[in-house]
Curated annotation (Swiss-Prot):
UniProt source species: Delftia acidovorans (strain DSM 14801 / SPH-1)
HAMAP family, per database record: BioF_aminotrans_2 (MF_01693)
UniProt-recorded name of the protein: 8-amino-7-oxononanoate synthase
UniProt cross-references to Pfam families, sorted A to Z: Aminotran_1_2 (PF00155)
Taxonomy, superkingdom: Bacteria
Catalytic activity reported: 6-carboxyhexanoyl-[ACP] + L-alanine + H(+) = (8S)-8-amino-7-oxononanoate + holo-[ACP] + CO2
Involved pathway(s): Cofactor biosynthesis; biotin biosynthesis
Known cofactor(s): pyridoxal 5'-phosphate
GO molecular function: 8-amino-7-oxononanoate synthase activity; pyridoxal phosphate binding
Family stated for the protein in its record: Belongs to the class-II pyridoxal-phosphate-dependent aminotransferase family. BioF subfamily.
Binding locations of pyridoxal 5'-phosphate: G114, Y115, S185, H213, T245
InterPro entries, sorted: Aminotransferase_I/II_large (IPR004839), AON_synthase_class-II (IPR050087), AONS_Archaea/Proteobacteria (IPR004723), AONS_Proteobacteria (IPR022834), PyrdxlP-dep_Trfase (IPR015424), PyrdxlP-dep_Trfase_major (IPR015421), PyrdxlP-dep_Trfase_small (IPR015422)
The UniProt record lists the keyword Methyltransferase: no
Length: 405
C-alpha cells in the first residue's frame, strides 16, 4: 500500500531547495524617522531597501496616518459586513466617487485586495464559450481569473499586437475579452494601450487593464497609464475597464476598478470576490482619500522618482557591459536587472544584504526560466546617495558572484 500523499511534501520542498526556488519570508518593520519606501528593518537589521512598492513614499506619510486614525475613531477598525449587506460605509462610498473623478471615468468600485479584484472580475465578464486573450507576462491574478472564468484562453506573445490581432481575427466567439497589465510587474515596461484598444474596437472585444504599477506614478498628476494614453474623460471608451491597486503608489491597501456605469454595475452584481467578502475597513478608505489628494497635488514626488530612475539606469551601464547582465527597458519604478541563473541571483541578493541593502531575487515561476533577476523597485523616498550606494554595492558583489553559466 502506498503512503499518504502528505508524505511527498518534504521531498517536494527539498526539490525546491535544490533548484534554489524555495521562498522565504522576512519580518520587516519601518525604521523610525526614516522615509517609507526606502528604509526598513529586515529580520531586525536596518536596511536600505529597493524592493518596496511604496513608489511615492506615502505609506508612512503623517497625513495618511492621521486620516486612518480619524477613520478608526469614526467607524471602528472593521467594516462588519460585505458591501451589499452592511459593509459599504459612507467612507468607502466617498472613496469610490473620488477615485472615479481622479481617473476621469464614470464610476469606480472599491475592493479589499488587488488579487481578489482581478481574480473576481474576469469570471464576471466571460465564461464557458467565450474567448479570453491574455498577454504572456500578465500578473498571476489575471491568469488565475482567466482560469476561473472557464472561457477559452488564448495566450498571445508578450506585447505582440500582431499575434493578438491574428488570434482575435481567428476567434468565432461572440464575447471576447482582452486582459493585460498596463505596467508589467516584473519587467517594468508599459503596454501599448492605444494599440490594444484599437484591436478591441476592431474585433468588438472588451479590454481589462491592470495598472497596479502605473496608478499614482504615470499620467498627468499620477492619474495612471490610461490617462497617459489620453483615453479618459471625454476620450474614455465604454469597452475599457481600468483596474488599479491602492497598496503601491497610494501607500495603503485594496484596489478598484473603474469604467462605464453599465460595466461597473454589472461587476457589482456578478463579481463573487466583491459580493461574498467582507468590505474593506472604512479607516483604510479614509487614509486613501488623503492619499489620492496628495497624489494629485504633489508632482514633485513623481519628479523625484523620475530622477532616481534616470540615475540608476545611467549608473548601471558599466556593470552591464562587464557582466553581461541585462537591464530591461523601463521608464517606471520597476527596474529589472536580469542575471540569469537562480544561484547567481541569490548570491547577488545575499551579497547586497551583507552590505545593508535589501533587494530580493525574483525567480521562476514568477519569471520565465533562465531570467532570474533583481527587481529593483525605486521610490520617491530614495535619494541620489541611496542610488549610488546601490550601484557601488552591485559593482562589488558582481565581482564575487558565480560566473554566468
Amino acid at each position: 500500500m502506498s503512503g499518504s500523499w502528505l508524505d511527498e511534501i518534504p521531498a517536494r520542498i527539498a526539490e525546491l531547495d535544490a533548484a534554489h526556488l524555495r521562498r522565504r519570508r522576512r519580518a520587516t518593520a519601518p525604521l523610525q524617522g526614516a522615509a517609507s519606501g526606502a528604509h526598513m528593518e529586515v529580520d531586525g537589521h536596518p536596511m536600505l531597501a529597493f524592493c518596496s512598492n511604496d513608489y511615492l513614499g506615502l505609506a508612512g506619510h503623517p497625513t495618511l496616518v492621521r486620516a486612518a486614525c480619524a477613520g478608526a475613531q469614526a467607524f471602528g477598525v472593521g467594516s462588519g459586513g460585505s458591501p451589499l449587506v452592511s459593509g459599504h460605509s459612507t467612507a468607502n462610498a466617498a472613496l469610490e466617487e473620488q477615485l472615479a473623478h481622479f481617473v476621469q471615468l464614470p464610476r469606480a468600485l472599491y475592493f479589499y485586495a488587488g488579487y481578489a479584484t482581478n481574480a473576481g472580475i474576469v469570471p464576471a465578464l466571460v465564461g464557458a464559450g467565450d474567448a479570453l486573450f491574455s498577454d504572456a507576462l500578465n500578473h498571476a491574478c489575471l491568469i488565475d481569473g482567466a482560469r476561473l472564468s472557464r472561457a477559452h484562453v488564448h495566450r498571445y506573445a508578450h506585447a505582440d499586437l500582431g499575434d493578438l490581432a491574428a488570434q482575435l481575427a481567428a476567434s468565432t466567439a461572440r464575447r471576447k475579452l482582452v486582459i493585460s497589465d498596463a505596467v508589467f510587474s516584473m519587467d517594468g515596461n508599459v503596454a501599448d494601450i492605444r494599440g490594444l484598444l484599437a484591436l478591441c474596437d476592431q474585433y468588438d472585444a472588451l479590454l481589462l487593464l491592470d495598472d497596479a504599477h502605473g496608478f499614482g506614478v504615470l499620467g498627468p498628476q499620477g492619474r495612471g497609464s490610461l490617462a497617459e494614453a489620453g483615453l479618459t474623460g471625454a476620450n474614455a471608451s465604454p469597452r475599457v475597464l481600468y483596474m488599479a491597486t491602492l497598496g503601491k503608489a497610494a501607500g495603503v491597501a485594496g484596489a478598484f476598478v473603474a469604467g462605464s456605469d453599465m460595466l461597473v454595475e454589472w461587476l457589482l452584481q456578478k463579481t463573487r470576490s466583491y459580493i461574498f467578502a467582507t468590505a474593506a475597513p472604512p479607516m483604510l478608505a479614509s487614509a486613501l482619500q488623503a492619499s489620492v489628494a496628495l497624489i494629485e497635488a504633489e508632482d514633485e514626488r513623481r519628479e523625484a522618482l523620475a530622477e532616481r530612475i534616470a540615475e540608476l539606469r545611467a549608473g548601471l551601464t558599466p556593470l552591464l557591459a562587464r557582466t553581461g547582465w541585462q537591464l530591461l527597458p523601463s521608464r517606471t519604478a520597476v527596474q529589472a536587472l536580469v542575471i540569469g541563473s537562480n544561484a547567481t541571483a541569490l548570491a547577488v541578493m545575499e551579497g547586497l544584504r551583507e552590505r545593508g541593502l535589501w533587494v530580493p531575487a525574483i525567480r521562476p515561476p514568477t519569471v520565465p526560466e533562465g531570467t532570474a533577476r533583481l527587481r529593483i523597485a525605486l521610490s520617491a523616498s530614495h535619494t541620489r546617495i541611496d542610488v549610488q550606494l546601490l550601484l557601488t554595492a552591485l559593482d562589488e558583489v558582481s565581482r564575487l558572484a558565480p560566473p554566468l553559466p
